[in-house]
Amino acid sequence: MLHLQPQNLLIQKTLNEAIEALRKGSPLTMDRIVSDFDYTTYHISNTAEDKSILLLSVKTKAWVSVSECQLDGSLTLLKFLADHYSSLGGVTIPSEVEPGYDYTLQITLAELVQESILQLSVLKTIILSFPFELAISKFIELSQQQPAPVEAEITGGEVAANGDNTLFTIKYRDEENIFIKPSNDRVTIIFETIFQDETDKIFGKVFLQEFVDARKRNRQIQSAPQVLYSHEPPLELKRLYQPPKVAEQSRRFITFVLFPRHFQTKELQFHSICQLTLFRNYFHYHIKCSKAYMHSRMRFRVDSFIKVLNRAKVDEDDENDELSAEGRQQARRTFTGRKIVY
């Protein structure tokens, strides 16, 4: 299976090209549009006056819903991004955002380092990680108020844990959302997805069942998050979200249950968030790959059957000779086209 990487390779390539051109004394005039998953667009540009300064702007469908996520009002999305990027070498935050985009960063090529390039290439993931960070903070608060029983994490119960009505929603696609529900012993991530046809539903169900079975078979991944698949909203959502009637028959809910072991450290926390933000793309990509593989196999079988039928055809000259020979026993052939000898 293909594991998608969170970084945008086109951004990395563009920035490295700009740095190399600046070192050679011939800086590039930059005006590039770079696309990413989930209706995300980047714009990398500079001005003719100073080509060593780049602007990286991003526009994503999830921006409005993510910026609305609040915990206690002390941390906003803009402050979260400023804290993350202001400490990087060669990256500053301009006072104005480029028109038509949601967020803009200013890049000084002469001071840019590889770590800054890597962080710039995951800008979309950093934006989407904001509600996850809030949910983990809320989990810590709830767990201190009401510690979870030890057996809750061991059994991985499917019933909603104790908590309040805090729910973070990421509206990142048309009619598809990500719901993040913190509680006192876990953080529940719920993906709302829509399948295009019945075939996608079948492949999706088989694909997710393999997630469950592989977790049971392999001891090395038994500590992975629990995966649940349902037609109806899970218990965590029933009182807080009412799905629209549009595409009701094609709507499904995929639930991941994260326990403290999945976000103990900052590195592990970011790795888990990256995997979750890319799950929908990973999931539907492999559904399409499975359908393409099935179609190629069917085409191969049809081609092999056509070859068999072509070999079974009777040549016109042979057929005339057999008909003109008076009294000759009519020749019979097998399905491969060979004559039967008596």
Curated annotation (Swiss-Prot):
Positions of post-translational Phosphoserine modification: 324
Protein's UniProt name: Actin-related protein 2/3 complex subunit 2
Compartmental location: Cytoplasm, Cytoskeleton, Actin patch
Organism in which the protein naturally occurs: Saccharomyces cerevisiae (strain ATCC 204508 / S288c)
Gene Ontology terms, MF aspect: actin filament binding; calmodulin binding; molecular adaptor activity; structural constituent of cytoskeleton
UniProt-listed GO biological process terms: actin cortical patch organization; actin cytoskeleton organization; actin filament polymerization; actin nucleation; Arp2/3 complex-mediated actin nucleation; microtubule cytoskeleton organization; protein localization to cell cortex; receptor-mediated endocytosis
Underlying gene: ARC35
Pfam families per UniProt: P34-Arc
Keywords: Actin-binding, Cytoplasm, Cytoskeleton, Phosphoprotein
Residues bearing the modification Phosphothreonine: 155
Summary of subunit composition and partner proteins: Component of the Arp2/3 complex composed of ARP2, ARP3, ARC40/p41-ARC, ARC35/p34-ARC, ARC18/p21-ARC, ARC19/p20-ARC and ARC16/p16-ARC.
Family: Belongs to the ARPC2 family.
Other comments on record: Present with 13400 molecules/cell in log phase SD medium.
GO CC, one annotated term: actin cytoskeleton
Lineage of the organism: Eukaryota, Fungi, Dikarya, Ascomycota, Saccharomycotina
Role summary: Functions as actin-binding component of the Arp2/3 complex which is involved in regulation of actin polymerization and together with an activating nucleation-promoting factor (NPF) mediates the formation of branched actin networks. Seems to contact the mother actin filament.
